Design a protein with these regions (language model features):
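Conserved catalytic alpha/beta cores of large enzymes that bind or transform nucleotide phosphates
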Residues: 64, 82-84, 96
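Generic alpha-helical structural element
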Residues: 4-7, 41, 70, 84, ...
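Short, flexible loop/hinge motifs at secondary-structure junctions
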Residues: 1-72, 140-141, 147
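General secondary-structure edge motif
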Residues: 31-35, 61, 75-79, 98, ...
């Protein structure tokens, strides 16, 4: 898969403890799978480590936040999985097959775990929306059925 690399450097070019100069010590890397315009890309984040030449302090940029802690899915890919499942009514087994044809093997259980994690992340929004909807005296709903094909 193609890879994009983002380099994160420490905020200051000098040691935050003593003000001494920093020397390159190494780096930590983390990869995240992302879906961009229906094409998968791996976003590789490299966080360089620097050591102070005077006090041996190690300085490194903080890791960027992820929607799912230590997960490989980026926000665009998670949005695509949820949109396919809930707006386009594409079951997870079919999504798994589609992604497999694009060269990325994502099991149904992995996709299901992502959906569960996203539901937990979105629960405060759901609660706020529920509270807002229930403030009115009337509630209207569309009961148009959606046909689902059996697998």
């Amino acid at each position: 898969l193609p890879r994009d690399e983002k380099r994160l450097l420490p905020a200051a070019p000098c040691c935050p403890n003593c003000g001494g100069s920093l020397s390159y010590l190494g780096e930590d890397t983390a990869e995240q799978l992302e879906l961009m315009r229906s094409a998968f890309r791996v976003i590789r984040t490299v966080r360089e480590k620097h050591a102070c030449t005077q006090c041996d302090a190690i300085v490194q940029a903080p890791a960027p936040s992820r929607p799912i802690e230590r997960g490989i899915a980026g926000p665009g890919l998670l949005a695509r999985v949820l949109t396919s499942k809930y707006a386009e009514h594409t079951p997870l087994y079919r999504q798994s097959e589609i992604y497999g044809r694009q060269g990325v093997e994502l099991s149904r259980s992995l996709l299901s775990g992502w959906v569960d994690a996203c539901c937990r992340l979105l629960s405060p929004l759901e609660e706020a929306l529920h509270g807002y909807v229930m403030t009115d005296g009337k509630l209207h709903a569309d009961d148009t059925p959606v046909q689902v094909l059996l697998p």
